[in-house]
Each structure stands twice: as structure tokens, then as C-alpha cells.
Swiss-Prot record:
Domain tRNA-binding, first and last residues per copy: 39-154
One Gene Ontology biological process: phenylalanyl-tRNA aminoacylation
Domain called B5: residue spans: 407-482
Domain of life: Bacteria
UniProt keyword annotation of Magnesium present: yes
Main location: cytoplasm
Protein name: Phenylalanine--tRNA ligase beta subunit
Keyword Transferase in annotation: no
Keywords: Aminoacyl-tRNA synthetase, ATP-binding, Cytoplasm, Ligase, Magnesium, Metal-binding, Nucleotide-binding, Protein biosynthesis, RNA-binding, tRNA-binding
Length: 802
């Protein structure tokens, strides 16, 4: 919201500097982005009167004699603008002047002709193209005839005004109007507002003879209109054009400019229809039908849906409610009779339509946040009165209206104790009365219980907490006492989840992995790509891009994108990990939030060790990846099993293992399927993913310190003849099933296959370590332990001790 300080001072008696005002507003709840003066950096710009204008042969140039109020007489200026002509008033930069981009104007010669200055366009003064009147977009600015040669252009075009840019949050949409800002400033400084009133002088003919209106949508609360006949469409007076341009709005003509003025003044969006272009007199506000089309004022054809609001005549859309009018009923220079519209449209519907069509306007931004119900009809009458003044129109008697809005003040009750407890203050009831008097709110009751009557212009206030905020703002945040919050002391230790994440991060980085952070949002296909049992997809309704539309259910797909990114840049040795959340949705994604699961994953590709003069290159393989996982679980003191699996279509069927904890699959480990790797454009890659939330539940509580035993351990080796399909895990399970408490370690140190063993057989050799923390082990005890283990191996895996 751009606020003219000149205009603001007409509405409220304030005599502080804009810097002070900006600081005060920012500290009371409305952020000021900055203050700028359009004339800043400009100098020596005056009104000029073109006395003569001669074409320069064989060029686009014109040799002009221009009166700039100098005693020496007219000055000669060479100008190339297509709309320069004798008799007009223009903007002249005299020698020594500064225009946009700090460009200095000097005396010079053009095609041998002396030029003592420059005739300027608004663009050359630094105004953006978007606000320059279209008739002057490709040429110089032509000033009204009453402009006096030699006068400074700054006050004439209000370039010396100070423009305050406000950043309006959705809860303070009341400040999207000059009246709203004036109320705010008046409350801050304890001043009163004075808004000019306009009285409509109505013709005897009733407006209802010309039009009728109806509402056929629950998204339209009220729809009111007035008819103004015999208007003269022409450029607006300079003061109105200046005001609109300083507010960032392009002047069009006096009729359209009046509706934009009222929008800025009241915050009430309005629209003007050419009455003679309406096919019939009955106007209906209704929901659009699927597939209906409307060409809007910007010349674009829009396809509508049932969620849109349209204004129709003869059952044909002529305006997109709350956003933009239609081209078919546009006001032009030939328009004579005008229908003014003031309505209240549903903000949610306007926002959806505006977003879907990518069509933002000053009107839509206000309807989205809300408008003041109190001034809908007042704004309509004000606009009609302005058309009487500026377009010589005749206003027909009465408004034509359908629907109504509630204009009764909102009653909110609270108590002095409630306020003081929440602000930590010792305010008196007199302080409360003073605050609400400044705000212009009614107040009844006493300290024990009082009721505030909130005008409809402040629709953001509805509960006690809102009143407390208003009191704090106007009383002054800087006056609130500084106190420390009262809370029970808490220990500064890490949570179990934080501790686990730190341990995993330390182990992963110790294994040579580099941490990455990938996008939580991905494509629907990648979201479920590495999920063994995918849950329902949680997708965004309006994603920024199609590649970021669904919440991920795995980390691996994002990691493979990172691997591909590195490989494409000649970094073929990749070792990365991530700790992040994946999302499981077991219900309806539109009604329920997904479960967030802490997850760890890594991806490795390329070489573990580079080739040098004495060692061979060592490529990444399944066992290297498994070693990282084993190291992780060993450090965490969590026992897991590895079970071969073919359930994951994106993983190699012969080199993938499910990671099982207490009978529950908590992750997987293995090689990415060659076809999947090809799809990603990456070489042979190994990945793993683990559900850290499940691991956290399995963590053992912190163990008390146990003294290191002084008694030695005893080791025994055992070689087993086994069937070739017996796995290492099955052998371990058999050994531990013997229940030997003194067995503290089992290590596989040899695997052998060959013809001597026979077909389908293999040999596996293990080192078993025993230890008694309280005594020396005897040979007899160790022999008994070995006997029990041998028996278990024979029974469980049909092992034969070699």
C-alpha cells in the first residue's frame, strides 16, 4: 500500500516528519517498508510552453521555441517526440538539470542545431511505464493548459510528495485504504480524522427504470449499483492523475479514475460498466458455469469454473466478480451512460480464482483480505458524486441493490484484570478508556467488566485477545514492563531423538560419508519409488512445480538425484548420507496429516580407494555398504538381521537385504537395480535406508559403568562343513542358540569351497571368544561350552565339525 503523505495530512492533523511517522507506525503494528520522494535526484525541471514547432527535413526531429519563463525569452530545444506540437505545455529540463539515473542535461547541438534543454517524458523522470498514461507512453507528457511557464514541475505533478510504502499483513487489511491509515495515525497520535463528504444531487428519474440487479450466489453478500447518465469521458484533472500515479495506478479516464480513487480512499473496489453496451437491463451476480469464457479488460480470454463469481447480463458474463471487468462493457471515450458497481464478494472464492487465473488486481487483493461493510454504500454514493463533478454526469435517483451486509458494531467484553495479567501492566480503567477513545471505539462498563463496541472498519477484532493487542499497540509496546517468563527449571540434556541423530551423524561421517539435505517434496513417482509398502500420497493442491508436488516416502530417490548431479560433473566417487523425515499417510491426505518418520539413508558409488603405485583400485560393493550399517548398529548396540529380499523393484534382486529388528523390517540395504541406475544416469550404486524412529525404540537405556575385568579371555577355533545354501546369519543364530553366557564374540575368519568338500558343500571357520568377568576360565569349562555349541550347530544347520 502506497500512502501519499500530502493526502494523509488532509485527512488527519499530523505534523511529524515521514521518518518519525514511519518509525511510530512500525512499532505499533503496521510495518513501513520505506519512504520515497518521486522528485529525489531530480532538479531544474519547469513548465514549458511550446511557441513554435518546425519539422527538421529528413529526420524525425523538431526544432522548437519554448517559453520557460526566462527573462531572456524563449529557448530553442530540439525534440524527437512524435507528439510534440506548437501550443502545448510540456516538462522542460533546462541546462544543469538532473533527470532519471542522475543524467545531467547540458547545452548541446543536435544535427548542427543548438538545443538549450530537453523536453521530457514521465519515463525520463524515473516513473515506471506501468503508471504512465497510455496516450503519453511513447512520447512526452503534455500538461494542462493552465500550467504556468517557468513554474517548477515538482508541486505541479506532486513529485515533491512523500510516499510511504506499507507492508500490510492479512489481519490489518483495514489499512488498505487512506481512511483506514488515517484512523491508525489518528489513534497513534491522539488526533481526530476529518473525511470530506460529498452529497449526491439526484435526478428525478429513478435508477430502477434503467437497471435491476439480482444475486444468485452465496458468494455474493451484497450487490449495489447507481446509474450516472450523460457523462463526458475525458482525462482526469491533474491532481487526480498525480494521486493515482503516486499510488502506483495508471490514470485511464475520469470515470475509471474515480473508481480507483474510491478504491484507494475507502478500500472499496468498484467497477464501472458502459450502460449502453449491456444487452439488457437485468444484472445478475452468480457462480460461473464450467467452461464459460470471458474476455477481461486486459484482452485475455479466461475460461471459468464453477468456483468463480461472474456478473452477467442476458446470462452472459460481463465481469469477473471482485477481480476484473470484461472488455465487452468497458468504458471508452464514447461512453455516455455508466453503471457503478459496489459489492461484497467472498474473499476465499476471489483468492482461488485469482490464483488459478494468475490474475492479480488491486480489487482482488482487497476482497481477499476483506472490505469495510460500513462504507460499501457510502463509497458508491461518493463515486457517483465525483462523476457529477468531474464528468458532468446526472445521477439517477436511488440505488439499485440486492442483498445486504451487517453494519452493526461487534461487541467484545473483557476485564481490566484480564488485560493487566496478559500484558504484565498495572493499567487503570482510565488508561483503557483513553486507548479506545483514540481508536474511535465505543466503551461501556467498568474495570470489573467492560464491553467494547468495535466498528466494522476493524473486522480483525472479535475476541478478548484482540482487545489486549489494541491496548498494547496504542498504549505503547515500549512502555510494557520487561519481565522474565516464569517456568520450571529444566535440565539441558539432549532428547533421545537428538542423541540418536548425533550418534548416527558421527558414525556416518566417520565412515567417510558427507551429509546432504534434499528436498522434502518430489514427484509422485519418486515419492514411492523405494518404498516396500507405499502409503497414500500426500500431494500439494497448488505446487510451485510438478517436480515438487508430493511428500517423499523415502530418502533414497532424492539421494540418487544428488549422485547423478555429481556424476554429471565428473565427480564419480560419491559417498553421501542424509538424516531427514519421510511421510507415511494411512488416511485421507485431504483430511489427515501424515506421520513423520525420522530416517537415515546413504548412497555410495565409484571407488573406495583410488589406484596408486602399490594398491589396486577398490570399487564399492555390497559388503562395503553392509560394513557401514554393521558399524552403525554395533555402535548403537542394536542387534539386527539381514534377510535377502526381492520385494523392492528398484533394487537389485540378488544384492538386496531387508534389515530386520525384532521381526520388523526397518530398512533395506543393497545395490540399485541396473535399470533404475540407468534411468537416473548413474553407475553402479549401493544404498541403504533405515527407520530411525524404530531404532530409537530399540535403544538400550544408558548402562552404568562396569569395571573392566582383569581375567583373560579364551579363544577357540571351529571349522564347519555346511551345505552351500546355509548363510552366515543362520550359523550365528545356531551358535547363540546354545545359550553359552560366557561367549562374548564370534568372528568368521575363513570361507572355503572346492572339489575336495564335495558338490553343494562349503567350509566356514569361526573364532569363538569366551570370558568370565569374575574368574579364570578352565579348559574343562571351555570344552563344555564348545560341546554345547557344536551340538546346536549340528541340530540347527546340520554342520559337521572338520
Amino acid at each position: 500500500m502506497l500512502v501519499s503523505y500530502k493526502w494523509l495530512k488532509e485527512l488527519v492533523d499530523v505534523d511529524v516528519t515521514t521518518a518519525e511517522l514511519a518509525e511510530k507506525m512500525s512499532t505499533t503494528g503496521i510495518e513501513v517498508e520505506g519512504v520515497k520522494t518521486p522528485a529525489e535526484g531530480l532538479s531544474k525541471l519547469v513548465v514549458g510552453h511550446v511557441l513554435s514547432c518546425e519539422d527538421v527535413p529528413e529526420t524525425h526531429l523538431h526544432l522548437c521555441q519554448v517559453d520557460t519563463g526566462d527573462a531572456e525569452g524563449p529557448r530553442q530545444i530540439v525534440c524527437g517526440a512524435p507528439n510534440i506540437t506548437a501550443g502545448i505545455k510540456v516538462i522542460v529540463a533546462i541546462p544543469g538539470a538532473r533527470i532519471a539515473d542522475n543524467y545531467k542535461i547540458k547545452k548541446g547541438k543536435i544535427r548542427g542545431m543548438e538545443s538549450l534543454g530537453m523536453i521530457c517524458s514521465l519515463a525520463e523522470l524515473g516513473l515506471p511505464d506501468s503508471i504512465i498514461p497510455k496516450e503519453f507512453a511513447d512520447g512526452i507528457q503534455i500538461l494542462p493548459e493552465d500550467a504556468v511557464p517557468g513554474d517548477s514541475i515538482f508541486p505541479y505533478l506532486d513529485l515533491d510528495d512523500e510516499i510511504i510504502e506499507l507492508s500490510i499483513t492479512p489481519n490489518r487489511a483495514d489499512a488498505l485504504s487512506m481512511r483506514g491509515v488515517a484512523h491508525e495515525v489518528a489513534a497513534i497520535y491522539g488526533k481526530s480524522v476529518h473525511f470530506p463528504e460529498k452529497t449526491v444531487t439526484e435526478d428525478s428519474k429513478p435508477a430502477s427504470d434503467k437497471i435491476s440487479v439480482a444475486i444468485e450466489s452465496d458468494k455474493v453478500t451484497t450487490y449495489a449499483s447507481r446509474v450516472v447518465e450523460n457523462v463526458t469521458v475525458q482525462p482526469s484533472p491533474q491532481w487526480l492523475q498525480n494521486l493515482l500515479m503516486n499510488a502506483g495506478i495508471r490514470p485511464i479516464n475520469n470515470v475509471v479514475d474515480v473508481t480507483n480513487y474510491v478504491l484507494l480512499y475507502f478500500g472499496q473496489p468498484m467497477h464501472a460498466f458502459d450502460l449502453d453496451k449491456l444487452e439488457e437491463s437485468h444484472i445478475v451476480a452468480r457462480d460461473a458455469r464450467e467452461g464459460e469464457k470471458l474476455v477481461t479488460l486486459d484482452g485475455e480470454e479466461r475460461e471459468l469454473t464453477a468456483e468463480d463469481i461472474v456478473i452477467t447480463v442476458a446470462d452472459k458474463p460481463v465481469s469477473l466478480g471482485g477481480i476484473m471487468g470484461g472488455a465487452s462493457t468497458e468504458i471508452d471515450n464514447n461512453s455516455k451512460n455508466v453503471v457503478l458497481e459496489a459489492a461484497v464478494f467472498d474473499g476465499k472464492s476471489v483468492r482461488k480464482t485469482s490464483s488459478r487465473l494468475n490474475l492479480r488486481s488491486e480489487s482482488s487483493s482487497r476482497f481477499e483480505k476483506g472490505v469495510n461493510n460500513d462504507t460499501v454504500l457510502e463509497a458508491l454514493d461518493f463515486a457517483a458524486a465525483m462523476l457529477q463533478e468531474l464528468a458532468n454526469g446526472s445521477v439517477l435517483a436511488g440505488r439499485v441493490q440486492a442483498g445486504s451486509v451487517d453494519t452493526e458494531p461487534v461487541q467484545v467484553s473483557t476485564s481490566l484484570d484480564y488485560v493487566n495479567v496478559r500484558l504484565g501492566t498495572e493499567l487503570t480503567f482510565a488508561d483503557i478508556e483513553d486507548v479506545f477513545a483514540k481508536l474511535g471505539f465505543g466503551l461501556t462498563g467498568d474495570a470489573d467488566r467492560f464491553t467494547v463496541s468495535v466498528p466494522r472498519r476493524r473486522w480483525d477484532i472479535s475476541i478478548q485477545a484482540d482487545l489486549v493487542e489494541e491496548i498494547a499497540r496504542i498504549y505503547g509496546y515500549e512502555k510494557l514492563p520487561t519481565t522474565l517468563p516464569e517456568a520450571a527449571g529444566t535440565s539441558g540434556e539432549l532428547t533421545k531423538t537428538q542423541t540418536l541423530r548425533r550418534k548416527v551423524r558421527t558414525i556416518a561421517e566417520g565412515a567417510g560419508l558427507t551429509e546432504i539435505i534434499s528436498y522434502t517434496l518430489t514427484t509422485p513417482e519418486k515419492a514411492v519409488e523405494f518404498a516396500a509398502t507405499p502409503s497414500n500420497l500426500t500431494e500439494l493442491m497448488w505446487p510451485m512445480t510438478v517436480d515438487r508436488s508430493a511428500l517423499r516416502q523415502n530418502l533414497v530417490s532424492g539421494m540418487l538425484d544428488t549422485v547423478a548431479y555429481n556424476v554429471n560433473r565428473k565427480n564419480s566417487n560419491v559417498a553421501i548420507y542424509e538424516i531427514g523425515k519421510v511421510f507415511e499417510q494411512n488416511g485421507n491426505p485431504k483430511e489427515e496429516l501424515p506421520n513423520e518418520i525420522n530416517t537415515f539413508a546413504f548412497a555410495i558409488s565409484g571407488l573406495v580407494a583410488e589406484k596408486d603405485f602399490q594398491t589396486k583400485a577398490t570399487p564399492v560393493d555390497f559388503f562395503y555398504a553392509k560394513g557401514i550399517i554393521e558399524a552403525l548398529f554395533n555402535k548403537l548396540e542394536v542387534s539386527v538381521d539381514y534377510v535377502a529380499t526381492k520385494d523392492l523393484a528398484s533394487m537389485h534382486p540378488g544384492r538386496t537385504a531387508a534389515i530386520v529388528l525384532d521381526g520388523q523390517t526397518i530398512g533395506f540395504l543393497g545395490q540399485v537395480h541396473p535399470q533404475t541406475a540407468k534411468n537416473y544416469g548413474i553407475p553402479e550404486t549401493y544404498v541403504a535406508e533405515i527407520n530411525l524412529s524404530a531404532v530409537e525404540d530399540a535403544l538400550k537405556p544408558a548402562q552404568p559403568f562396569v569395571e573392566i575385568t582383569k581375567f583373560p579371555a579364551v579363544s577357540r577355533d571351529i571349522a564347519l562343513l555346511l551345505k552351500a545354501d546355509i548363510t552366515h546369519q543362520e550359523v550365528l543364530d545356531a551358535i547363540y542358540s546354545a545359550g553359552v553366557k560366557r561367549l562374548i564374540a564370534v568372528k568368521l575368519f575363513d570361507v572355503y569351497t572346492g572339489e575336495k568338500l564335495g558338490a553343494g558343500m562349503k567350509s566356514m571357520a569361526y573364532s569363538l571368544t569366551f570370558q568370565n568377568p569374575n574368574d579364570n576360565l578352565t579348559d574343562e569349562e571351555v570344552a563344555k561350552y564348545m560341546e554345547k555349541i557344536t551340538k546346536a550347530l549340528t541340530e540347527k544347520v546340520e554342520a559337521e565339525v572338520r
